Amino acid sequence: MSRPTKADWADDEEFDDPSALPPQQITTNKDGTKTVVSYRFNDEGKKVKVTRRIKTTVVREHVNPQVAERRTWAKFGLEKGHAAGPSFDTTSVGENIVFRPSVNWKAQAAEAEKNGGEKGSIKDQLKDKKVKCRICSGEHFTARCPFKDTMAPVDEPGAGGAEGGAAAGEDAAGGLGAGGGSYVPPHLRKGAAGGGERMAGKYEKDDLATLRVTNVSELAEEQELRDLFERFGRVTRVFLARDRETQRAKGFAFISFADRSDAARACDKMDGFGYRHLILRVEFAKRAT
């Protein structure tokens, strides 16, 4: 009489592994779409059911017959045996750029080559250039000048010079009082009568062509916003508010155009535009009072 063999636990078909996931289910719907039901574990280790609805769209593209034939060739050389299509480690797929030369592109190319030979490259031209402030002539950008709110640019009327220095000396001396030595506020000193006009004149930021964009993604970049709005006209300034600690966007930005008509067209087209899974709200910026 033969001895009965001991059953192996791996042969038990009814064994249920609590960590195993149910198989993926694919259902074809009447409208041609497919419903894919799959399971996965989330970060907390819980089993999560994921339902996706997939619609297949066939896009017909007319290509050159010779190009279509070359795509059917088997790969050779170092790529022999690899799957069809471009390989990401050897091929870089870029954007298809449509080149439209101008009518007189030959003359422009010849002129650019001639000017480049005479003046040298742009790098050589800017090699000895230094940043110079238009307000105080210091070696910093004009926007970062500490005197931009109190001084006019050097090439504007009222800027500091030989005569301006003398006048400044008189104002500085008179700033402490007409003669009694008492303190006089800056807006009551000599030459400050037109302060209000100066603030409301050419030195005030022109908000007539500035758009306020809200509901901006915190992952947005200034260059991306510039590319989005430059389709409607020349953009002079892009300001994206960021958090000081995280350097992420706060959710709003200001876009300034050179022409108000371009700003109006951009406001009409971009209001309600989807950007980074959010709907942008675009309106004209209100003038600060």
Swiss-Prot record:
<comment type="subunit">
    <text>Component of the eukaryotic translation initiation factor 3 (eIF-3) complex.</text>
</comment>
<keyword id="KW-0648">Protein biosynthesis</keyword>
<protein>
    <recommendedName>
        <fullName>Eukaryotic translation initiation factor 3 subunit G</fullName>
    </recommendedName>
</protein>
<keyword id="KW-0963">Cytoplasm</keyword>
<dbReference type="InterPro" id="IPR034240">
    <property type="entry name" value="eIF3G_RRM"/>
</dbReference>
<feature type="region of interest" description="Disordered">
    <location>
        <begin position="1"/>
        <end position="33"/>
    </location>
</feature>
<dbReference type="GO" id="GO:0033290">
    <property type="term" value="C:eukaryotic 48S preinitiation complex"/>
</dbReference>
<dbReference type="InterPro" id="IPR000504">
    <property type="entry name" value="RRM_dom"/>
</dbReference>
<dbReference type="GO" id="GO:0016282">
    <property type="term" value="C:eukaryotic 43S preinitiation complex"/>
</dbReference>
<dbReference type="InterPro" id="IPR035979">
    <property type="entry name" value="RBD_domain_sf"/>
</dbReference>
<dbReference type="GO" id="GO:0002188">
    <property type="term" value="P:translation reinitiation"/>
</dbReference>
<dbReference type="GO" id="GO:0043614">
    <property type="term" value="C:multi-eIF complex"/>
</dbReference>
<dbReference type="GO" id="GO:0003743">
    <property type="term" value="F:translation initiation factor activity"/>
</dbReference>
<dbReference type="InterPro" id="IPR012677">
    <property type="entry name" value="Nucleotide-bd_a/b_plait_sf"/>
</dbReference>
<dbReference type="InterPro" id="IPR024675">
    <property type="entry name" value="eIF3g_N"/>
</dbReference>
<dbReference type="GO" id="GO:0006415">
    <property type="term" value="P:translational termination"/>
</dbReference>
<comment type="function">
    <text>RNA-binding component of the eukaryotic translation initiation factor 3 (eIF-3) complex, which is involved in protein synthesis of a specialized repertoire of mRNAs and, together with other initiation factors, stimulates binding of mRNA and methionyl-tRNAi to the 40S ribosome. The eIF-3 complex specifically targets and initiates translation of a subset of mRNAs involved in cell proliferation. This subunit can bind 18S rRNA.</text>
</comment>
<keyword id="KW-0396">Initiation factor</keyword>
<comment type="similarity">
    <text>Belongs to the eIF-3 subunit G family.</text>
</comment>
<feature type="domain" description="RRM">
    <location>
        <begin position="209"/>
        <end position="287"/>
    </location>
</feature>
<dbReference type="GO" id="GO:0001732">
    <property type="term" value="P:formation of cytoplasmic translation initiation complex"/>
</dbReference>
<dbReference type="GO" id="GO:0071540">
    <property type="term" value="C:eukaryotic translation initiation factor 3 complex, eIF3e"/>
</dbReference>
<dbReference type="GO" id="GO:0071541">
    <property type="term" value="C:eukaryotic translation initiation factor 3 complex, eIF3m"/>
</dbReference>
<dbReference type="InterPro" id="IPR017334">
    <property type="entry name" value="eIF3_g"/>
</dbReference>
<dbReference type="Pfam" id="PF12353">
    <property type="entry name" value="eIF3g"/>
</dbReference>
<dbReference type="GO" id="GO:0003723">
    <property type="term" value="F:RNA binding"/>
</dbReference>
<keyword id="KW-0694">RNA-binding</keyword>
<dbReference type="Pfam" id="PF00076">
    <property type="entry name" value="RRM_1"/>
</dbReference>
